[in-house]
Amino acid sequence: MARTLLTDDIWQQIQDTMRLHGCYCSKNSRNIMEAILWKLRTGATWRDIPQEFCPWQTAYNRFNRWASKGLWDKFFFRLRGVLDQEWVFIDGSYIRVHQHASGARNGSERAIGQSRGGRTTKIHLATDANGLPIDFKITGGDVHDSQVAEQLIETVEAADYLIADKGYDAEPIRIFIKNKNMIPIIPMRSNSKRLNKEFDKYLYRLRHLVENAFARLKHFRAIATRFDKLARNYQSMIYIACMFIWCKAK
């Protein structure tokens, strides 16, 4: 028998959220959700989903239909708990793209780039003071962290401090953070001649929390390696993983 992930408590949270968004909950809705989580956890193909959950077509059709309607991200934001925003973190992480993710007809919908490690996607993640996901953006792996910084910072509604690594060391980014009434905790590059009065070594050491968040996301093999052709579907997989992390944390 296939291992399941949904406890009664987690399923109740998800089911209530589905109903709030007008989604019909049939008697096999829990099994369909288990099938989608099984795919997320194992990274296997949709056709390999155990029949004991439901036919693989049923699981795929529901996942794809809700992804196209933008429902998975709505579920995440509804299930996301109270954020601890005394300080927040932003960072990026490369994801290797499997050959099965190639071939999407519209290149603009792929978020796949060619970098030194081959074909990659990059997840740009913002987390709260507990290392729990606030939101994220995905781009091709050839996109530098600083290029997505402002979009990512916009997802952080309020915080006292924003902590990031040297990849975000740029004066326009620091100004943008300060304009949001946050203090940037970002180390200077080695060749920088500017003063860094705001830098706090203690707070910067806490940056492992965002790295831990990436580690939790990559426990799901469909996140650790990208198998989805469309950026929309891969993004939805990440939202489901973030949703599950929050449900477990409550």
Where are the regions that the model predicts?
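Short alpha-helical elements
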Residues: 1-250
